[in-house]
Amino acid sequence: MIVGIGVDVVDIERFGRQLERTPGLRDRLFVPAERELNTRSLAARFAAKEAVAKVLGAPAGMNWQDCWIGLDQNGPTIQVKGTVLAVAESKGVKRWHLSMSHDGGIATATVLAEG
C-alpha cells in the first residue's frame, strides 16, 4: 500500500549560494557523511529530504538530520531516526523508495513511502 508520495525540486546554483552565505547551514541540513559532497549532490539530497517531509505532512519538530540519504549496492537509500522515524512509523511506513536526479541546473527527488 502506498502511504504517500513527495516530489521536490531545488535550483542548484541558488542552493549553493545559500550554503555559502549562511554559516552553519550545511551542518544543520546534512549529517557528516553528506556534508563533503558537491553542491549538485547536496541539492538533490535536500530535495529528497523535502520530499520525505511532504510525504509525512511536514511534521512539527522535524530535524533535517533525522533524515539522510545513504547509498547501497542498489543506489540511494532513505535513512530516518528521531521525529521523522516516529511519524513514519505512526503512518505505517515500512519501506522508502527514492529517485534523485540533476540536470540543467535543477536537482529533483521523488519519494514514495510504502506501508
From Swiss-Prot:
| CC per GO annotation | cytoplasm
The kind of enzyme this is, by top-level EC class, is: transferase
Pfam families cross-referenced by the UniProt entry: ACPS (PF01648)
The UniProt annotation places Mg(2+) binding at: D8, E50
Show the InterPro entries listed in the entry.
Answer: 4-PPantetheinyl_Trfase_dom, 4-PPantetheinyl_Trfase_dom_sf, ACPS, Ppantetheine-prot_Trfase_dom
Give its E.C. classification number.
2.7.8.7
| Cofactor(s), names only, from the UniProt record | Mg(2+)
Listed under GO biological process in this entry are: fatty acid biosynthetic process
GO MF terms held by the record: holo-[acyl-carrier-protein] synthase activity; magnesium ion binding
UniProt keywords, alphabetically:
Cytoplasm, Fatty acid biosynthesis, Fatty acid metabolism, Lipid biosynthesis, Lipid metabolism, Magnesium, Metal-binding, Transferase
The compartments listed are: Cytoplasm
Quote the catalytic activity from the record: apo-[ACP] + CoA = holo-[ACP] + adenosine 3',5'-bisphosphate + H(+)
Chief subcellular location equals cytoplasm
Query: Per its UniProt entry, which superkingdom is the organism in?
Result: Bacteria
User: What is the role of this chain?
Assistant: Transfers the 4'-phosphopantetheine moiety from coenzyme A to a Ser of acyl-carrier-protein.
Assigned protein family: Belongs to the P-Pant transferase superfamily. AcpS family.
Matching NCBIfam families, A to Z?
pantethn_trn, PRK00070.3-2
- Could you tell me what this protein is called? Holo-[acyl-carrier-protein] synthase
Species assigned in the record: Arthrobacter sp. (strain FB24)
Phylogenetic placement of the source organism: Bacteria, Bacillati, Actinomycetota, Actinomycetes, Micrococcales
Q: Which gene is this protein's source?
A: acpS
